[in-house]
């Protein structure tokens, strides 16, 4: 920040972006360039009086020159545009004129930088040969999710304050250290807030840009869109058997299970196999040297967590235990195994990792900015919310490493868990589902195919689930509140996550928390029904 001292613009930006402040006292010539992708320079001067000097000082100009020679610089000015004539604008990557040094100007500028607010203004004066009167570009916000007044989408703004209250009460009651909550309607965000902190030590506030371990939301955010595409292309049918999809399932008790059965959780596949327990010492749950080392090597190359590496064949041994697992009687049995099995089918067919398939087919087309497997490849720890202090397997604080034990043995990339994301990116994927495969001019799959996946096929057998999606319980009592439509769909995650979309009201709800920190034994989120109560409040806020 140059010019007048001010924290407001930085605080507004920090809610949207994972940013750090460069102090004026820094030696800019010795800046660690690898640490920053770009630098935002704001210049603020009082606009209360025309007699107040609002020009850039010589020191300001030198700082801008130094920074722009090292890294991409976004210059945001809250002052008279005539002052820009003294700056070498050729080195500036982006220039945003906000004019007014007030709260509205700072708020609008912060949203414009992250693509949530339109930019339509033109220069009212000429400031250089290159930037003349009338210059300027028009940038529209992402075609999805502009931020709007709740009333514009038929929502009572005052009623939403009850969600704020419930969130704060939940944090005070140690339901979770913090949370992100988003609600959208008609493709527009009317509620998007962060509450609390990363941990109960309150050292770092939750930002909207922070990412959470979303646990089983991975099933519908990563694996399911790819499977729907495969179905849409005729590569997978509902009556396709596991044995026909991959030879690894032949001559096993899972050979004849159909895609429809396993993805509707009707096949009798058991909920999970705690394979990791076999790799620990019984007396103290410490990793056995037979399977783990604290240093990476050719033989121990599966990164389980910080400073813990699994043996090269550990994932194979685990997968064999999943294939060899017993079957229960057919009926609704929610399980992690179906999406793990389908991950194998996809990876074997395309000779690509699920991570690569997700990036190629989902993340890049949707322009997701904050959704990753193995997030430490993309983010600093400060922007990742920890999930647990693990004293039963990895013996470490889990931050940036998947919480789920089965996914952990798989190196963090799995069909059932492993994805990290924030509320905004999740809402994008849910909006794509809500629009039945269409998003911003792209068609991910046909609407007819989506309808087939959002249908309950085993309702008469007492199974509420669709193909991959969770659905409301017919008589209530589930994650959703009783008044939600049967057409609605979504999923929940073990770490304290939840997302739901309703085609009838066109409302999307995203709730992220780390209720498992510091211990997954904390069940207050479920016991106090926080997510369901918040969803009910959203529906009670509907005006029309």
Regions found by a protein language model. Give the residues of each.
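C-terminal non-catalytic regions of proteins with extracellular/luminal or membrane-system context
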Residues: 1-154
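Short, surface-exposed loop or secondary-structure junction motifs
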Residues: 254-486
């Amino acid at each position: 920040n140059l010019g007048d001292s001010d924290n407001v613009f930085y605080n507004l930006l920090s809610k949207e972006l994972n940013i750090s402040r460069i102090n004026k006292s820094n030696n800019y010539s010795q800046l660690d360039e690898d640490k920053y992708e770009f630098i935002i320079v704001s210049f603020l001067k009082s606009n209360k009086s025309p007699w107040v000097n609002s020009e850039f000082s010589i020191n300001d100009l030198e700082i801008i020159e130094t920074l722009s020679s090292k890294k991409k610089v976004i210059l945001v000015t809250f002052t008279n545009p005539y002052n820009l004539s003294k700056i070498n604008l050729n080195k500036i990557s982006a220039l945003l004129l906000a004019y007014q040094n007030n709260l509205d100007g700072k708020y609008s500028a912060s949203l414009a930088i992250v693509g949530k607010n339109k930019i339509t203004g033109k220069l009212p004066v000429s400031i250089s040969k290159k930037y003349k009167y009338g210059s300027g570009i028009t940038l529209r916000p992402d075609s999805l999710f502009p931020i709007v007044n709740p009333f514009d989408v038929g929502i009572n703004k005052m009623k939403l304050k009850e969600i704020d209250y419930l969130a704060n009460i939940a944090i005070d009651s140690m339901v979770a250290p913090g949370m992100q909550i988003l609600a959208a309607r008609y493709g527009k965000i009317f509620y998007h807030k962060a509450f609390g902190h990363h941990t109960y030590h309150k050292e770092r506030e939750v930002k909207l840009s922070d990412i959470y371990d979303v646990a089983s939301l991975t099933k519908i955010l990563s694996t399911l869109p790819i499977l729907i595409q495969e179905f849409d292309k005729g590569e997978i049918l509902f009556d396709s058997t596991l044995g026909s999809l991959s030879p690894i399932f032949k001559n096993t008790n899972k050979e004849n299970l159909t895609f429809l059965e396993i993805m509707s959780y009707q096949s009798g596949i058991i909920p999970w196999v705690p394979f990791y327990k076999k790799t620990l010492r019984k007396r103290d749950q410490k990793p056995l040297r037979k399977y783990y080392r604290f240093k990476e090597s050719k033989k121990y190359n599966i990164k389980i967590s910080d400073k813990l590496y699994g043996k090269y064949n550990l994932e194979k041994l685990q997968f064999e235990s999943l294939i060899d697992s017993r079957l229960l009687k057919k009926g609704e049995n929610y399980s992690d195994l179906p999406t793990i099995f389908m991950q194998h089918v996809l990876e074997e067919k395309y000779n690509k990792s699920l991570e690569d398939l997700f990036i190629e087919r989902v993340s890049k087309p949707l322009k997701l900015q904050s959704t990753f497997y193995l997030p430490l490849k993309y983010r600093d720890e400060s922007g990742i919310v920890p999930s647990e202090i693990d004293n039963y397997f990895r013996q470490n604080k889990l931050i940036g490493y998947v919480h789920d034990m089965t996914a952990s043995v798989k190196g963090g990339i799995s069909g059932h868990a492993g994805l990290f994301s924030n509320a905004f990116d999740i809402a994008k994927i849910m909006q794509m589902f809500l629009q039945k495969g269409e998003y911003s001019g792209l068609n991910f799959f046909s609407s007819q195919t989506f309808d087939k996946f959002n249908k309950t096929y085993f309702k008469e057998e007492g199974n509420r689930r669709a193909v991959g999606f969770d659905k409301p319980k017919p008589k209530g009592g589930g994650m959703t509140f009783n008044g939600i439509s049967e057409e609605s769909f979504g999923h929940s995650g073990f770490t304290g996550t939840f997302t739901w979309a309703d085609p009838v009201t066109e409302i999307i709800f995203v709730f992220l928390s780390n209720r498992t920190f510091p211990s997954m034994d904390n069940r207050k989120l479920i016991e106090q029904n926080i997510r369901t109560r918040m969803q009910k409040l959203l529906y009670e806020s509907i005006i029309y």
